[in-house]
């Protein structure tokens, strides 16, 4: 099964809600950081993907139709290149809103140096994505904004959806060419 959707949006941009939404629309299973916690054998290969080292990208997402959140967003361009038919989904929110949520949830986990089995992947995110400064507010916001701008710049407009947190079903369903469900959009944000 080839990956059909590459999620390029950072964690804390509604990625867990998006995972649920994509699965409801038939694009599941959808990979998310929560899957890594249940697959410790995937940690080192994900670190390799983030660091740009040789790794079997197909194996990392084997069995998944979509992937969102960290770690895939940290290597989004590798996956977009490897799966040229896949659509790119960039989930976003305001930089200040993202920082507040990130700082209160995943930021300290990324900054920590004691991750046990997840160490190599979290180190890769901390060093490669955030340049070793994941809790430096101004730097992290600049990284977030530069990442989003890079995704938009490098992806053809007919291949990307920039999805603003809270936009509901319509833009997503239009982009994917599927009907809008007759139910509320999933709301899975655990912290601001």
Q: Where would I find each of the regions flagged by the language model?
A:
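Alpha-helical packing segments of well-folded alpha/beta enzyme cores
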Residues: 75, 144-151, 168
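A conserved mid-domain beta-alpha-beta active-site/ligand-binding segment of alpha/beta enzyme cores
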Residues: 121-148
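Short, well-ordered alpha-helical microsegments
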Residues: 15, 73-77, 99, 168-172
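PAPS-dependent sulfotransferase catalytic core
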Residues: 1-62, 122-131, 181-192
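Phosphate-binding beta-loop-alpha motif at adenosine-nucleotide cofactor sites
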Residues: 135-139, 154-171, 175
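Conserved phosphate-donor/acceptor-positioning beta-strand/loop module used by diverse small-molecule
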Residues: 79-104, 172
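Glycine-rich phosphate-binding loop used to anchor ATP phosphates in small-molecule kinases
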Residues: 60-83, 88-91
